[in-house]
Amino acid sequence: MKLENAELKHIERIVAISKAAFDSDIHVGASEAAAPPDYDSTAWHIQMKNEGHLLQAVIDGEIVGGAILFVDKDGETLYVGRIFIDPVHHRKGDGLSLMKMVETFYPGIRKIKLDTPLWNARTNAFYTKLGYCEVKRDKEFAYYQKELD
């Protein structure tokens, strides 16, 4: 898998994967209204691409997922806005590969932060498996953090 800055010519594919991935959450406890804001919006994904936050995950020339990432002003903290993998690639290790690439994409990152809905047992287990520690929770989300070496 390669992780690279998203290309405008691939936006429609990236949006389709985002929609399919978040729509598949209905199978792990989501209500129909549980997807993140703008997960199916082409305009929003173009904005994220233009601001340098949208990445595409590629395997053998095929886009299989994406990530929305934000680097703090300190240059040492990365916030994972969201990651998504085509449901066809679920349970094949591709999400794990994507997160490992996210963790090394920006040089100098020492801490990664993210959040995920409490109802989503799949993502909560996934981030714990990757070594993320829950640092806080509220009524809707669990907040995770990982210190990098």
Which stretches of residues belong to each language-model region?
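A short beta-loop-alpha structural element at the N-terminal edge
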Residues: 2-16
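Conserved GNAT-fold acetyl-CoA-binding loop/helix
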Residues: 19-44
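A short helix-loop-beta-strand connector motif used in the catalytic cores of GNAT acetyltransferases and
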Residues: 42-56
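Conserved beta-strand in the GNAT
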Residues: 56, 62-71, 77-79, 84
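Conserved acetyl-CoA pyrophosphate-binding loop and the N-cap/start of the following alpha-helix
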Residues: 89, 93-101
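Conserved beta-strand-loop-alpha-helix junction that forms the acyl-donor binding cleft
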Residues: 90, 113-124, 140-142
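Conserved active-site alpha-helix within GNAT-family acetyltransferase domains
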Residues: 96-97, 118-137
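Conserved GNAT acetyl-CoA-binding A-motif
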Residues: 99, 105-118
